Amino acid sequence: MVDLRILRMTRLSIPLAASTAFLPLAAYANAECSGHQLLTAPRPETSCREIISQIFVSPDKATHASVLPADVSLYATPDMESRVVIRSSRGDTLTSQDHSSPRGANGYYVHRAQWSPDSEFFVYSMISSGGHSPWSFPIMVYSRKKNLFVKFSDMIGGAPTVSGDFQFSGPHTLTATTWKQPGDLDNKVPISVDLEQAIEKLATKQ
């Protein structure tokens, strides 16, 4: 599910190596370039020349969050792992978070993302690029006031989130899903957190 506030799909050009001319055109045409897929054979190194990013604009239009394919492993589509970049509406980069792994098989890609109604928090859930713990959907929270990313699990005593879906109520209260008892994946329960209060509590502990 993609937030309706995606402003546009931008295309990033990737410079081609000098060896490009020696690869058959069919290799590029047949390359898998999206869909969060693992590939049985490596795609050409200079394939997927146009990488698509998703841009999420805050309700007040002041801040943009870009979800970019990390493009680490040739045995996967470029979007198998993600980077998240936060920018002002003027184009200034405020901060970023890289969810890629050294070999492209132990990181995460963004599953769902959304700004809070008050524009103070950007929230996104993720899925493991290597298929590890398929029941787990880590959620990250970006605080515009603090200009930092924090794990939602740190706000709920270290418990995992077991669904990629979440929703907002009020200006910045987030409701996600965790387990009722540790290890019990058959009994899931909703949990709601006031993100502003939770961020302040975490800040005082640091």
Spans of model-derived segments:
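Beta-strand-rich domains and repeat architectures in extracellular enzymes and scaffolds
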Residues: 44-78
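Beta-strand C-termini and the immediately following turn/loop, strongest in propeller blades
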Residues: 67-78, 124-129, 176-182
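Short glycine-/Asp-/Thr-/Trp-enriched loop segments that recur within the blades
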Residues: 102-108, 158-163
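Acidic, small-residue rich beta-repeat scaffolds with periodic aromatic anchors
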Residues: 30-56, 142-206
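Blade-terminus and WD-like Trp-Asp/Gly-His loop motifs, strongest in beta-propeller folds
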Residues: 55-69, 113-121, 164-175
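Structural motif
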Residues: 77-84, 131-140, 183-193
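N-terminal secretory signal peptides that target proteins for export/translocation
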Residues: 1-10
